[in-house]
């Protein structure tokens, strides 16, 4: 009877772990945060090339959008810990109509900003895209010409 109980408990544990695997986990090379999956791509691309690359990965995938300090902290840790020397990293924020109206590429609400001191400064009236600023440990943002080449973070909702 004792052996039957151990086997039954083992089967129950296996069933529960399999029933929890509903495809709501991020792939192995992606990180999970607040219901989304993120992955840093070290290839250097313009902002638009990076956004198009993310969109081609899967439906609903875009450059990352950040909506709270905890989002910034998780991504900063991920980049700093796994991709030392990546440089600045594109996120999905952009001023599409050049009126200093910032919008996320995934069309989520723009309710949070983490600008570096003195930013956005729109140097030479040509800084309409946003990256995570490397010297801040990837916690602060800087506006940059969209044609600059940087690694980037893609994101999709679970």
Swiss-Prot record:
Cellular localization per UniProt: Secreted
Q: What SUPFAM superfamilies is this protein classified in?
A: C-type lectin-like
| Residues binding Ca(2+), per UniProt | 127, 142-143
- Specify one Pfam family: Lectin_C
Q: Which cysteines are joined by disulfide bonds?
A: 26-37, 54-154, 129-146
Residue ranges constituting the C-type lectin domain according to the UniProt record: 33-155
Tell me which tissues or organs this protein is expressed in. Expressed by the venom gland.
User: What is the name listed in the Swiss-Prot or TrEMBL entry for this protein?
Assistant: C-type lection lectoxin-Enh3
Native organism: Pseudoferania polylepis (Macleay's water snake)
